[in-house]
């Protein structure tokens, strides 16, 4: 499951209540949700987890991760000042990155990843197809992704997109939430004038493409005549 979209804002979620992605999505109202990074047997996240400046977990490394600043936009940075979630760096500016992986992370497994297109759009990968890191890098490069991070995978891989979902019975302590930014419809001067001057009713304005009857046309023309 893959989706590429304009992201308006994102959030790191610390799942202390052990909610499912569906429960979190219903509670918060995000458009996309995926599992986060690795965790230990005590349900504690490993690597860096920072939420609004509060450090939940940390390690000795200062590598790239999902960094969310005051504007709410996720980026692949090392800045941990706002919100931050670690990941395994896969790509930067279209170049493959390599990090030493433990055997359980390096093996073929279901994968979750977050990437960025050259134009800034976010690419989310959440799929049960078993891939190595190198195969995932190849898939993301094929989609045109320039920057990318690999998150937890295997049985942790889970997510919900507007057009699909990947399920898992495993609860995970961190998740990433995204809100797709919808393009605002272009303003139509004629419709704005009709609204401002009472030429069209609220019902007619709500359905601008609907054909009008002769009676409705006569009423519109009559209202225009009264204004002159």
Regions found by a protein language model. Give the residues of each.
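Gly/Ser/Thr/Pro-rich low-complexity, intrinsically disordered segments
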Residues: 1-182
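Short, solvent-exposed alpha-helical surface patches in non-cytosolic proteins
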Residues: 185-199, 203-228
């Amino acid at each position: 499951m893959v989706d590429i979209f304009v992201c308006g804002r994102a959030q790191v979620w610390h799942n202390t209540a052990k909610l499912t992605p569906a429960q979190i999505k219903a509670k918060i109202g995000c458009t996309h949700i995926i599992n986060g990074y690795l965790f230990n047997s005590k349900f504690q996240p490993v690597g860096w987890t920072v939420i609004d400046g509060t450090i939940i977990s940390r390690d000795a490394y200062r590598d790239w991760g999902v960094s969310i600043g005051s504007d709410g936009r996720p980026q692949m940075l090392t800045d941990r000042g706002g919100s931050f979630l670690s990941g395994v760096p896969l790509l930067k500016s279209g170049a493959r990155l390599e990090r030493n992986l433990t055997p359980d992370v390096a093996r073929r497994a279901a994968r979750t990843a977050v990437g960025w297109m050259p134009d800034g759009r976010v690419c989310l990968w959440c799929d049960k197809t078993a891939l190595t890191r190198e195969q995932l890098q190849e898939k993301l490069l094929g989609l045109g992704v320039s920057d990318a991070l690999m998150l937890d995978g295997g049985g942790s891989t889970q997510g919900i997109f507007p057009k699909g979902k990947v399920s898992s019975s495993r609860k995970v302590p961190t998740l990433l939430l995204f809100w797709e930014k919808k393009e605002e419809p272009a303003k139509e001067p004629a419709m704005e004038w009709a609204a401002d001057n009472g030429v069209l009713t609220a019902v007619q304005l709500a359905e601008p493409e609907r054909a009008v009857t002769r009676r409705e046309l006569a009423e519109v023309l009559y209202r225009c005549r009264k204004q002159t």
